[in-house]
Amino acid sequence: MALFVISINHKTAPVAIREKVAFGPEKLADALERLRCRPDIDEVTILSTCNRTELYCATPGEPDEISLIEWLGQYHQVSLTELKACCNIYNDEDAAQHMMRVASGIDSMVLGEPQILGQMKEAHASGRAAGSLGGPLDRLFQHAFAVAKRVRTETAIGENPVSVAYAAVSMASHIFSNMEQNTALLIGAGETIELVARHLYRAGVRSLIVANRTLSRARDLAAEFHGSAIGLSDIPEYLHRADIVIASTASPLPILGKGAVEKALKRRKHKPMFMVDIAVPRDIEEEVSELADVYLYTVDDLRQVIEDNMKSREGAAEEAERLIAAGAADFMYHLRALDSVSVLRRFRDQAEGVRDAELQKAIRLLNRGDDPESVLRMLAHGLTNKLIHHPTVQVRRASAEGRQEVTGWLRDLFQLPDEKVNND
């Protein structure tokens, strides 16, 4: 059995690649079913966020990572050359350590951000629901969650984290000196957009429009900040009002196109618009950036804002890395120990079989009236001979073949004392 992870993330691939290999909710169940049916995979699940797509796998034998990368390319119609250039592969203990780093927020663009742990738990739940988890990989997820909890409680990694939402609003504040006079249009109503709304409100924005596919959710979020709610189809009608547009949905296709933005700019008399597209795949067409009066940024453009704020938590990150390394080593120690369980069970069954056979023989002799002491001596002699016969034969054969290490294993296994050297 082997564990491995295939990772495409914000460090290895730009958003243009990441959006191609993203698994939306409509694709995830189908992808897991296809992977689950592969004979070279025992367990599998997928994590897909705006910053990463990762395949977590357990295989019955040596893993064939390239075959899985080929599958990923075929599924998303991306060339193998393009994918191989931006994939990181982690095996066994490195895979365990990587999963714990991801769950703890250490591998995130935003160091220590808490959202990733929830996303990892969703990936775990998806695998369980698909029937593609239930063994060592399942236990690794549980262990990773426990380590992530320790990192959160025993280090300062999560104190005042700078989120992608915060970074987006921070960039807007550099462009608009007085946010109270601005109107913000938020596309989506998930956790990230909710954080954006909170940061905008704290920054002084009081005119907020929330657009979402589910209008009731948009109304609930808008009500918290005294804003208004619209459906996605209403965006063209309201777009010209927005000075700030921040988008983060799970849509597989762009929601806001160049044509709609051009019309909005005309109605605004070309007053500039600031846009941040946090979504992967992107919600705003890339061509919108060609318009002279639009400042369009993607999640990758927020990196510098985030990195500037990460330096204060570098010490906490080092402490977290130590906890993660220890957690990964501990998991692999127990996982390797499990590999011996079936062998030890067969060994015990064999020994108990020898014991029962010799015991029955002794009972028959006692019932026949034989001397009890002689019967006990025969029982002890029979047990000793039967139990050590096969190991003795195998050790002698190994020594004759030059495999002296077997003798050392026997010494360690039975804690045999070193031979005394007679110097007389």
Swiss-Prot record:
What's in the keyword line of the UniProt record?
Answer: NADP, Oxidoreductase, Porphyrin biosynthesis
Q: Mind telling me which residues the site (Important for activity) is annotated on?
A: 98
Keyword 4Fe-4S carried by entry: no
Identify the metabolic or biological route this protein is part of: Porphyrin-containing compound metabolism; protoporphyrin-IX biosynthesis; 5-aminolevulinate from L-glutamyl-tRNA(Glu): step 1/2
InterPro entries the record matches:
4pyrrol_synth_GluRdtase, 4pyrrol_synth_GluRdtase_dimer, 4pyrrol_synth_GluRdtase_N, GluRdtase_CS, GluRdtase_dimer_dom_sf, GluRdtase_N_sf, NAD(P)-bd_dom_sf, Shikm_DH/Glu-tRNA_Rdtase
Q: Where is the active site?
A: 50
Molecular function as annotated in GO: glutamyl-tRNA reductase activity; NADP binding
Q: Which domain of life is it from?
A: Bacteria
Q: Which residues bind NADP(+)?
A: 188-193
The UniProt record lists the EC number as: 1.2.1.70
Catalyses which reaction(s): (S)-4-amino-5-oxopentanoate + tRNA(Glu) + NADP(+) = L-glutamyl-tRNA(Glu) + NADPH + H(+)
How the protein assembles, per its UniProt entry? Homodimer.
General function of this protein: Catalyzes the NADPH-dependent reduction of glutamyl-tRNA(Glu) to glutamate 1-semialdehyde (GSA).
Please tell me what else the database record remarks about this protein: During catalysis, the active site Cys acts as a nucleophile attacking the alpha-carbonyl group of tRNA-bound glutamate with the formation of a thioester intermediate between enzyme and glutamate, and the concomitant release of tRNA(Glu). The thioester intermediate is finally reduced by direct hydride transfer from NADPH, to form the product GSA.
The text of the family note is: Belongs to the glutamyl-tRNA reductase family.
**Protein name per Swiss-Prot or TrEMBL:** Glutamyl-tRNA reductase
Q: What is the lineage of its organism?
A: Bacteria, Pseudomonadati, Pseudomonadota, Gammaproteobacteria, Oceanospirillales
This chain is encoded by the gene named hemA
